[in-house]
Amino acid sequence: MRARRVVAAAAVLLLFAVVAVARLDLDDDGDDSEVLDELLAVDEEEERGELGGGGEAAAAEAVRRAQSMVLVLDNDNARRAVEENAEVLLLGYAPWCERSAQLMPRFAEAAAALRAMGSAVAFAKLDGERYPKAASAVGVKGFPTVLLFVNGTEHQFTGLHTKDAIVTWVRKKTGAPASRIQSKDSAEEFLKKDQTFAVGLFKNFEGAEYEEFVKAATSENEVQFVETNDRNVAKILFPGIASEEQFLGLVKSEPEKFEKFNGAFEEKEIIQFVELNKFPLITVFTDLNSGKVYGSPIKLQVFTFAEAYDFEDLESMIQEVARGFKTKIMLIYVDTAEEKLAKPFLTLYGLEPEKPTVTAFDTSKGTKYLMEAEINAKNLQDFCLSLLEGTLPPYFRSEPVPEEKGPIEKVVGRTFDSSVLESPQNVFLEVHAPWCVDCEAISKNVEKLAKHFNDLGQTNLKFARIDASVNEHPKLQINNYPTLLLYPAQDKSNPIKLSKKSNLKDMAKFVKEKLQIADVETVAAGDIVKDEL
C-alpha cells in the first residue's frame, strides 16, 4: 500500500506541470491531453483506494511520460523561463510542506482545465528548498507560492487553493475577465461546471456601464464573471431575470441561490455587491477559506461549533436566521472534530467542545461574544440582532466563582468588578499565570505581606490574586507576569504599579506609604523583615 501511495504521490507531484513551458517544442497537443487524463485518473483511483498492481504500472508510465514534457525550474533556468515566455504560472513548493502537497493536485486540475480552454499560459514548478537562489530570483518567499508572470510582471495568487479559484484568477489576469456566452447550449454546459458566478446582460458589449462591469470583473479575483447579450441565454443562467435590457446578478450553489444587483453600474459598487454576497448563508470554515473569512468585508461573524451530526439538526434553523442578516452578519460553521480549526477559537473562550456552542466576533474591534442561552431560532435571532445593534455585552473568560474566600481572595473574570473595582477597600492585586517563571517567588512574598497586614488589623486593605491566563476583564490589560497593582479605595480607575523586583521589605514600605499607614519604620524593621529572612 505504501508503494502505491508513493507512485500515486509522484503522479500528483507531476500532474500540475504536464503542460509544457512555451519554449519547449511540443507539437502533439493530443499527447498532452492524453497524459493529463491518465494522471487525473491515477489521482482519482488513489482517492478511491482502487489503485491496484496494474494501476501502479499505469501510474509509473504516466509519470514517465509527464517527466518528458515538464520543465523543472532550477538555479540556471528559472529567471530565463520567466523572461522568455509571455505567460507563466509557477508553483513554488517545498517537499516537506503539507500545504504544498494539498495544493498540487488542485493546481494540476487547474492546469488541465486551462489547457482544455486553449489557454496559452505555461506551467512550471520550482522546489524552493533545493533551489533557494532561483526561488529568490523569481519571488518565491514562502511555501506554497503561486505566481503568474505576464510579460515579466509578477502577480501573486492569494485566493482559495481550489481548481476553480486558480482558473478564474489566471483567466482574469490574462485578458479574459468575463466569459462570453451566446447560446443556450453553451449556457447549459457552463452550468454543469460553474456553481458560483456573476452574470451580466448587456444589449451591446459597449458603453460606460459595460466598461465598469469589465473593470469589476478584472478586479474581483475569485468569482467568475460571465456576459451575454441574449435574454434567453441570461434566463438559463439566472431564471428570475425580468425585462431589463441591462442586468447583473450573482448565482450561488445553495438554497439562497440568486441575488440581483440593484446598485449603480460602477466598479466599486459591483465589487462590493459580489464581496458581500458571494459567501453562502452558512460558510463551512476550512483551512482553504480561513483567510477569506478573516478578511471578509463582513466584520460581524457568528460561529457555530458542533460535531457534524449535531449540526445537521441545527443547519436549517441557522440558515433561516441567516437570511435575515445577509450582507450584515456572516454565519459560519466549524466542525469540532477538526481540532486544528476549532481548538484555537474555543481556547479564546476557555471552552471545551463538549456541546454545540455559538460565539461571535467583531473583527473590526477585536471583541468576542458568547451566546449562553439555548441554541434555538429565537435566541439566535436575538443574539444576532443585539450584535448588529451593538448592545451585546462582550464576553470575557472567567473561571467559576470561588465559593470560599481565604486570606488572599481569588478573583475571577466575573468577580473583578465586585471584588476589585467596586470594593470599598484598598486592593493589592497580584496578576499571575501558571507558566510564569517568576510568579511562584512573588506569590510567596504576597502571602507573607497579606499575613503581616492582617495581623496589624488593617481591615481597609484586601489582598487578592487573579490568574490572567484563564480570566479576562476589559479593565485588566496585562501582558507581563507577574504584575503587582495597588487599587486605592478613592481611585480605582488608576491602579499603582509596583515593580516585581521589589523585595518583601520594599513591598511593605510601598503599601504603607501609598495608603498612609502609620508606623512605617517600625514595620519595615520589624517582623516582616524576619519573615523575609
From Swiss-Prot:
Active-site residue numbers: C97 (nucleophile), C436 (nucleophile), C439 (nucleophile)
Repeat as UniProt keyword: yes
SUPFAM superfamilies, sorted: Thioredoxin-like (SSF52833)
Glycan attachment points: N151
Annotated Thioredoxin domain residues: 51-196, 387-516
Gene Ontology molecular function, alphabetical: protein disulfide isomerase activity
Chemical reaction(s) catalysed: Catalyzes the rearrangement of -S-S- bonds in proteins
GO BP, sorted A to Z: protein folding; response to endoplasmic reticulum stress
Similarity comment text for this entry: Belongs to the protein disulfide isomerase family.
Protein name according to UniProt: Protein disulfide isomerase-like 1-5
Species this chain originates from: Oryza sativa subsp. japonica (Rice)
